[in-house]
Structure formats: structure tokens, C-alpha cells
């Protein structure tokens, strides 16, 4: 029977895309394995793979009940899909030599299913080692206090391998231990520690110190840490996609033609992922900052949430049919048309970052965006919004020096026009911190290229985990 590896991502496009890249990588370098990826029927935004090395199995699913928080939905879908998954894995095991199941954190409900079938389970951590350190240390933090992180406010948490992290900067779903989401995350962290191994979308050169601390067991002081395999960066190979999703087209996006006419490394790109929405007031402030900076820019703008009281971001799709111009200062588009372009909702992020005219990136610090930027050698300004992005920001700014920070209002986490103008200008033209960041990101890019090359650290890690599966 053919040696088979099954991948089971949660129904989030970014997770599916990254898991597909892992499957392609396995199929390319270890063709002895048959790769099957199981997708829930809820994966409506799932990209299509034409890789001959990957078999896609669509799993029927039972709709989960409405969740109080948006981020609970992937957990709930996996929990309500366990019986279907059990049948699918049993069917695969009856005709193939099933060596391992690879899941992500949101599909954690699959862990006991695989254990009952005697299938070794590996977690694929789609973010970086900095966020992984937080997740692995959560059970320890949970046992050290009875308070929720939201009640600890700006109290500093000491997580091995990371700069000091404010309790308020922990991933959003961890803020209140009374939330169902918190319980799901805590269970996922505990299961991850008990798994056969953790595959991470990073590389040794980018996060060497944090990876070393994790491997030494400092994040999990009371139990053995599972084997860690840094196999990244895994960047979407179909370059007309981005981390945030969106419709793609065979026709070249107009923003790329505009970039063709701009000087080398002169344009700052602003893009905030699929859920990054700002209030109308913040959009106007951002526009004013870009105008004051005098820097060339390409700005992807999503309409603000319909709830005018929203102060920062929302995952809502409401308002997508609204004109962007109404949220800009009067005359802004006309005054900046010679040096700026505003794109509604979506742009081909990987192609933009890889364009020779782009010299900077204002990002929400989503991990896919970070590794895409570093892989392209583009320095960043960090503007974290949700999920684990504040942890990623701490790594980018304080540890790796690959991004400049933004000062935010204590009241509503807004950024002033002057602050954005100052940091964008420093990133693109500055001789101080901006120059350091520009130089550091080019060095980090070289490290990534080396890690992915034959004999590089990521290839060695992939071979190491594959060797475990071969031994079975």
C-alpha cells in the first residue's frame, strides 16, 4: 500500500493556501508519499490546486451553530465534523498506509479522532516561531494566574524567546478565559504539546533564537516539547493570490501597470489583509499622512464597517459596493494622482511586493504578509490589527529590526496622520532606523533563499520529518 500523508486544514483561505504549499513541497521533494488534503465543504474560498502530487478530498460537513465571536467558527466547524472525518480517515487507512495526519490549530478537534485510529498527528503552525512560543507557553501562563489577560492590561508577560509582551497584546481570542474561544485555544495548545511534532512556516535564519529556545523546552517547562520542524517560508506559488483572498483574473491587475511607470524602490505599499478595515475617520487620517509624506504610494482600501462607531477593524464585508472616494479627504485623489494609486479591496500582493518599484510595506503583520515581504526584500512599517499580529509586531520591531513601529492612541489604537507620514518617510528615505531596517530585510531575504535551497535548513527540516514518516 502507498505511504500516505493526510493534510486537514481549517476552512480559512490563508490556512488552506499555506497547507497546500506544504503539500506541494512534500510532493516535490518526497514523491514516495501520496498526499491527500481533506477540505471541509465550508471551505468556500478554497483555492484550487492543479498539482498532480496532491489528491483533494471534499468532506461533507454539518453546519456549526452561530458563534458569539467570528474567530470561533473554524473551531466549531471542525468539532461538528469529527464523525465525517473519522469515516474519511478510516476509509483512507483501509486502502493506504496512512503514516501521519497534519492539522492546524483550528482543526484541533481532529487530534482525538486520529489518536483513536492510531494515526500520528502533527500540527502545521501557519504563523511563525514567535507566535508558536506564545501558544506553547499558554498552558503555563494559564496555571500561573486566575486572571484573564484583559484584566492584566499592560502588565508585562515574560514568554521565553520573546521581548516582553503586554498582556493586552496577547492574541485576541486569549484575552478572556471565560470565553469559549479561550477554551478552544487552550485545548489546542495542550494537544499541540502532546503531538508527534510541530511543522512551522518559518526558517532558522529568520527566527533562530526563538526556535532554539522552543527546542530547548523553555516554553513548556513541565513536559517534553515535541520535535520542531522549521520548513518555511511557504509562500503561495500561484502569484496572483494574496493572504487576504479575493477574486483573481488572468488579466494583469492595473496596479502592476501603474507600478511599471514608477522609479525603482520608490513606492510604499499599504495593505491590511482580508479583515483589515478602518473607520472612516482613520481612513481620512491615513490619506492625510500619505499626502504629507510626499512619498509615492499604492494603497489597498476596504470600505469601513457600516457601524460608524467601529474604531478600528472588522471582519464584516458590508459596504463593499461603496465608493472609496467618499472616505477620502476632499480632493485627495486628484492632488495625489501623479504619485499615488488607491485600489479598492484587493491587489495581487505577492506580485506587488515582488515589483521592482516597491520599496516599503505598511502591513497588519499577518504572518503570510511578513514572509512575503521578507522574501521580496521589502522593509515594513508595522500596524498590527487582530489575531496574533501584535506578537508578530514585537518580533519584527524589537527582535529582528525588519519593521518600524507606529505610535498609537491609548484610547482607540488610532494612528495620526503625522505619525504615519513620519514613519513612512523614515522607512523609504531615512538615514537612521529606516536605513537599518532596509539593510536588515535584505540580509533576511538572503537567509530565506539559502534556507530553501538544496541542503538549506528548511530542506533539512523537511527531510527530518519525512524520515519519521518513512520509519512509520
Predicted ranges, named:
Residues 1-472:
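Glycosyltransferase specificity loop/lid
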Amino acid at each position: 500500500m502507498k505511504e500516505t500523508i493526510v493534510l486537514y486544514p481549517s476552512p480559512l483561505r490563508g490556512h488552506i493556501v499555506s497547507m497546500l504549499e506544504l503539500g506541494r513541497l512534500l510532493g516535490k521533494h518526497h514523491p514516495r508519499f501520496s498526499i491527500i488534503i481533506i477540505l471541509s465543504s465550508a471551505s468556500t474560498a478554497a483555492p484550487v490546486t492543479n498539482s498532480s502530487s496532491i489528491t483533494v478530498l471534499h468532506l461533507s460537513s454539518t453546519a456549526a451553530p452561530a458563534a458569539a465571536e467570528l474567530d470561533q467558527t473554524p473551531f466549531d466547524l471542525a468539532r461538528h465534523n469529527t464523525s465525517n472525518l473519522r469515516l474519511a480517515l478510516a476509509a483512507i487507512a483501509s486502502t493506504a498506509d496512512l503514516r501521519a495526519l497534519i492539522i492546524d490549530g483550528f482543526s484541533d478537534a481532529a487530534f482525538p479522532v486520529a489518536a483513536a485510529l492510531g494515526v500520528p498527528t502533527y500540527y502545521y503552525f501557519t504563523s511563525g516561531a514567535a507566535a508558536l512560543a506564545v501558544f506553547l507557553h499558554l498552558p503555563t501562563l494559564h496555571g500561573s494566574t486566575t486572571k484573564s489577560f484583559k484584566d492584566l492590561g499592560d502588565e508585562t508577560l515574560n514568554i521565553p524567546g520573546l521581548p516582553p509582551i503586554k498582556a493586552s497584546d496577547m492574541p485576541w481570542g486569549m484575552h478572556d478565559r471565560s470565553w469559549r474561544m479561550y477554551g478552544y485555544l487552550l485545548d489546542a495548545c495542550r494537544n499541540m504539546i502532546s503531538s508527534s511534532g510541530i511543522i512551522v512556516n518559518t526558517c532558522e535564519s529568520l527566527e533562530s533564537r526563538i526556535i532554539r529556545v522552543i527546542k530547548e523546552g523553555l516554553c513548556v517547562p513541565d513536559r517534553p516539547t515535541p520535535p520542531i520542524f522549521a520548513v518555511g517560508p511557504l509562500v503561495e506559488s500561484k502569484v496572483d493570490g494574496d493572504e487576504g483572498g479575493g477574486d483573481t483574473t488572468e488579466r494583469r491587475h492595473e496596479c502592476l501597470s501603474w507600478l511599471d511607470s514608477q522609479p525603482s524602490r520608490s513606492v510604499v505599499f499599504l495593505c491590511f489583509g482580508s479583515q483589515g478595515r478602518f473607520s472612516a475617520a482613520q481612513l481620512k487620517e491615513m490619506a492625510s499622512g500619505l499626502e504629507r509624506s510626499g512619498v509615492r504610494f499604492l494603497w489597498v482600501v476596504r470600505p469601513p464597517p457600516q457601524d460608524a462607531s467601529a474604531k478600528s477593524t472588522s471582519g464584516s464585508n458590508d459596504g463593499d459596493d461603496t465608493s472609496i472616494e467618499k472616505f477620502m479627504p476632499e480632493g485627495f485623489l486628484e492632488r495625489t494622482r501623479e504619485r499615488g494609486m488607491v485600489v479598492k479591496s484587493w491587489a495581487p500582493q505577492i506580485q506587488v511586493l515582488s515589483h521592482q518599484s516597491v520599496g516599503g510595506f505598511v502591513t497588519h503583520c499577518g504572518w503570510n504578509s511578513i514572509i512575503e515581504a521578507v522574501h521580496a526584500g521589502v522593509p515594513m512599517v508595522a500596524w498590527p490589527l487582530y489575531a496574533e499580529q501584535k506578537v508578530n509586531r514585537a518580533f519584527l520591531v524589537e527582535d529582528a529590526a525588519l519593521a518600524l513601529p507606529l505610535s498609537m492612541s491609548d484610547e482607540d489604537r488610532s494612528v495620526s496622520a503625522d505619525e504615519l507620514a513620519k514613519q513612512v518617510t523614515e522607512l523609504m528615505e531615512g538615514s537612521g532606523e529606516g536605513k537599518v531596517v532596509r539593510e536588515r530585510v535584505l540580509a533576511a531575504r538572503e537567509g530565506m533563499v539559502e534556507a530553501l535551497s538544496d541542503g538549506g535548513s528548511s530542506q533539512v527540516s523537511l527531510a527530518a520529518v519525512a524520515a519519521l514518516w518513512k520509519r512509520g
